[in-house]
């Protein structure tokens, strides 16, 4: 009898140890503002031989569902974990507490508010980051993080190949219809798509565009062209994301979407970003694109607490 019961008891014990499967009811009960389960600045084991990606999320910004930098970065970290040999490290509030994390990162990503208050441009930080660029570290900026004042943007041109320049570039909300995609590792597994976001365009690019590859392009409504530069380009196709092969051998990527947190539920949106981070870290992107499995319920995790009103769940694009 014991020979029969022992395996059954062992199975039961294992089931209890693992716990019940996550259900929709569990997701509904979960605190959407609980960020305690996201490991911060967690380094890999000493014997780790893969690629390290440092993901830096900005401070709280905008209203609920917009500029959810921490929650979006947590999602991105989970997506990157689906690629073997990649170790994402999450830092928060615009800058890592442990600056030594920069020294071992194969790629550095910033997802935060930019312009004059950009965490990257404060004090001597650009000089510190230049040292990382000089050793070939990948550089990735998402959404508002691509926005720099001209005096800082000149340096960023060498890091990322382009940036959003105030009063030159423009930042409207519009439905971008991406009809064609270039042959590039970042576009592997990505299909043409249409998605509403705050897609910036009219980027400041260098005169010498060698090494620069537009990744996402679409034709915006002419009514959104309100700067002198963009007004002169009515009907023209515009670039909303780009890759840059730097002269030093490093790689940069700029992505202007990411205003609406809900867009992480779009598979092509996720795959472009994940592929780009892998590419920037010099990880071979699979021919079918990176794995980006995602549960839409995760849109409502790790959010910043904004406002005092009743919580309204964030739904995927097109859902009501």
Functional labels for PLM-detected ranges:
Residues 1-5:
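Positively charged n-region of N-terminal signal peptides that target proteins for export
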Residues 6-19:
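Bacterial N-terminal signal peptides
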Residues 18-26:
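Signal peptide processing junction and immediate N-terminal pro/mature segment
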Residues 25-48, 75-78, 82, 222-224, ...:
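Extracellular ligand-binding/catalytic regions of CAZymes and related secreted enzymes
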Residues 29-34, 55, 61-141, 145-148:
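Helical hinge/lid and interdomain linker segments adjacent to catalytic or ligand-binding clefts
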Residues 31-41, 165-248:
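Catalytic beta-strand/loop cores that center a nucleophilic Ser/Cys/Thr
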Residues 49, 72-76, 101, 125-129, ...:
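Stable alpha-helical elements in mature extracytoplasmic
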Residues 115-192:
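A glycine-rich, often tryptophan-bearing local segment used as a flexible ligand/cofactor-contacting loop or short
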């Amino acid at each position: 009898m014991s020979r029969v019961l022992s395996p059954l008891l062992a199975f039961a014990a294992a089931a209890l140890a693992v716990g019940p499967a996550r259900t929709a009811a569990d997701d509904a009960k979960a605190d959407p503002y609980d960020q305690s389960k996201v490991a911060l600045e967690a380094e890999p084991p000493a014997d780790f031989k893969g690629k390290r990606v440092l993901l830096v999320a900005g401070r709280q910004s905008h209203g609920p569902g917009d500029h959810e930098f921490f929650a979006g970065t947590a999602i991105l970290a989970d997506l990157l974990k689906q690629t073997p040999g990649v170790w994402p490290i999450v830092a928060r509030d615009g800058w890592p507490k442990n600056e030594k994390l920069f020294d071992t990162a194969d790629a550095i990503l910033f997802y935060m508010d930019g312009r004059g208050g950009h965490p990257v441009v404060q004090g001597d930080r650009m000089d510190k980051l230049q040292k990382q660029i000089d050793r070939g570290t990948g550089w990735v900026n998402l959404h508002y993080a691509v926005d720099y004042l001209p005096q800082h943007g000149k340096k960023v041109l060498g890091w990322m190949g382009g940036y959003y320049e105030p009063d030159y570039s423009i930042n409207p909300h519009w439905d971008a219809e991406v009809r064609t995609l270039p042959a590039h590792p970042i576009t592997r597994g990505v299909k043409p798509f249409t998605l509403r976001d705050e897609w910036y365009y009219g980027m400041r690019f260098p005169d010498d565009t060698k090494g620069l590859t537009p990744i996402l392009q679409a034709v915006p409504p002419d009514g959104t062209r309100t700067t002198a530069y963009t007004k002169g380009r009515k009907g023209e196709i515009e670039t909303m994301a780009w890759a840059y092969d730097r002269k030093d051998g490093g790689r940069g990527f700029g992505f202007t979407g990411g205003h609406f947190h809900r867009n992480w539920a779009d598979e092509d949106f996720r795959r472009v970003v994940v592929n780009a981070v892998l590419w920037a870290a010099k990880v071979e992107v699979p021919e079918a694109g990176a794995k980006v499995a995602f549960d839409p319920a995760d849109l409502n995790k790790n959010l910043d607490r904004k406002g005092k009103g009743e919580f309204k769940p964030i739904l995927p694009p097109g859902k009501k």
